Amino acid sequence: TNSESILALTLPDHSLESWNTVAISASVHVDADTHIEFVTYGKHADLMGALLLAPLTGNGNRITRPLKMLGNIIRHPLRFLRMLWPFGWSGRTLIILVMQSLDNAIAFRAKPKLFGKGIKLVTEQDAEKPNPTYIDAGNKAAEYLAEHTNGIAQSMSLEAMANIPSTAHILGGAVIGSSPADGVIDQNQRVFGYQNLL
């Protein structure tokens, strides 16, 4: 899987209409391994922010990251309260999807359900190649954008509160090939056998 971090930037007002564009509107390669994409949700996806985001939190472990998040809340209580207001969130928020092409993995495990029949699928850090819980380039990008837009930079709540990594691509991407025999997409990200499907 990709090394990933999912961050967000909530703008102070609706003047930019961030929702009124394609879902992935821009991207930049900040170094040889790190690619940042800017993603928008539709203007009626406010629940996403209320459930998934916390104040931007720096590097640390399962003890220090929650403490850093709490310190951020104490230092900026009004910003934190503004962040909690879910109404209109998706219409003024950019998701900052940070991806790295480093070799790491998430392990899947089937475990029996605690009550009842069946199994549940759980994920764990791969012991040999764990994916990172913090990507510095992503936090720097979120801080830079917040400073230049007067917005509020945010981390995924599981990353900030429990130092658990997040990913939007748990099974990897589409294989790039020279033909349908050895890939799903070509070098220009076009799906083989389809027109206008990127």
Predicted regions mapped to residue ranges:
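Mid-to-C-terminal "cap/lid" subdomains and adjacent gly/pro-rich loops that border
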Residues: 1-89
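A glycine-rich dinucleotide-binding beta-alpha-beta segment and adjacent secondary-structure elements
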Residues: 94-97, 120, 125-198
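Short, flexible loop/turn elements at secondary-structure junctions
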Residues: 3, 13, 100-102, 178-180
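A generic structural signal for short, solvent-exposed coil/turn residues
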Residues: 30, 88-90, 100, 115, ...
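C-terminal catalytic lobe of FAD-dependent flavoproteins
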Residues: 51-147
